[in-house]
């Protein structure tokens, strides 16, 4: 039903206060019922106080009241110059890596008190942003580049979005290729120093469509690697490819759930 929220209804609370109060309430209720809780958030709030304040979404604080947080880090949604990238839409791999590096920093600080923080399952772009002056066509190659960036940044899960629901399946893997990639990722991460693993039941690269295609709604594609690496288990701010270049011998892993301080 229609509702009007007037200034007097806020009782002095900010947008952030209202959002976090609600999230804390619903997280306790839903978890008590044995349910997992997730939320989609704007990607721009991760490293921008201006964007965070304007919509009331504070990334690290919201992550304390969720099991999964899904930042919408579509390269097309970043303005020219973001993360030092002239035209983010034209460099999907670099843009996703930059956004997830900032995500890791924010969640590192959010978890310094030893409390819970959500696992990260980012939204990736599977559409062409033709409204941008500086854009490129998105197809299987660009989808794969973004997925590779997720894995290289130490995360395992992702979602694809296309409002037209015309997904580029050639950017995804067959079960056989996904198994091979999972083994490669696990072997590569095992070479990294100070990395902790939380083994889970192996999963596959995405070949499934989530519910939500009813009544004209668009469906979303989701997937994850099968290594079970969790938030806080990868050297912060360090892409897999970069870490492999400097890694010599595996060091002593920290306790599960800990992480290194973020790099500059």
Would you name each region that the model predicts?
Residues 1-4:
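Active-site groove signature of glycoside hydrolases
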Residues 6-41, 46-49, 53-130:
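Glycoside hydrolase catalytic-domain groove-lining segments
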Residues 26-28, 197, 224, 238:
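Surface-exposed charge patches in extracellular/virion surface proteins
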Residues 32, 171, 180-190, 212, ...:
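Polar/charged alpha-helical tracts
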Residues 66-77, 97, 102, 106-193:
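Substrate-binding cleft of secreted/luminal carbohydrate-active enzymes
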Residues 194, 201:
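Ligand-binding clefts of soluble mixed alpha/beta catalytic domains
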Residues 207, 211-264:
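Long, low-complexity, intrinsically disordered segments
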């Amino acid at each position: 039903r229609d509702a009007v929220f007037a200034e007097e209804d806020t009782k002095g609370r900010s947008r952030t206060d209202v959002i976090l109060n609600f999230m804390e309430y619903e997280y306790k209720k839903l978890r008590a019922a044995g349910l997992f809780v997730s939320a989609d958030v704007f990607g721009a709030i991760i490293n921008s106080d201006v964007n965070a304040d304007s919509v009331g979404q504070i990334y690290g604080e919201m992550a304390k009241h969720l099991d999964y947080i899904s930042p919408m880090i579509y390269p097309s949604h970043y303005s020219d110059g973001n993360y030092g990238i002239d035209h983010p839409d034209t460099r999907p791999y670099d843009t996703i890596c930059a956004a997830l590096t900032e995500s890791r920093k924010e969640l590192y600080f959010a978890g310094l008190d030893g409390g819970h923080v959500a696992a990260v399952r980012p939204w990736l772009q599977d559409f062409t942003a033709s409204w941008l002056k500086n854009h490129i066509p998105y197809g299987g190659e660009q989808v794969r580049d973004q997925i590779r960036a997720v894995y290289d940044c130490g995360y395992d899960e992702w979602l694809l979005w296309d409002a037209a629901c015309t997904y580029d399946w050639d950017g995804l893997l067959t079960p056989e290729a996904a198994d091979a990639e999972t083994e490669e990722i696990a072997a590569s991460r095992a070479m990294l120093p100070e990395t902790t693993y939380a083994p889970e039941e192996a999963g596959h690269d995405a070949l499934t469509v989530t519910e939500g295609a009813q009544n004209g709604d668009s469906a979303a594609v989701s997937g994850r690697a099968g290594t079970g690496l969790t938030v806080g288990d990868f050297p912060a701010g360090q892409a897999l490819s970069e870490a492999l270049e400097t890694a010599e011998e595996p060091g002593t892993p920290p306790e599960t759930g800990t992480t290194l301080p973020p790099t500059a």
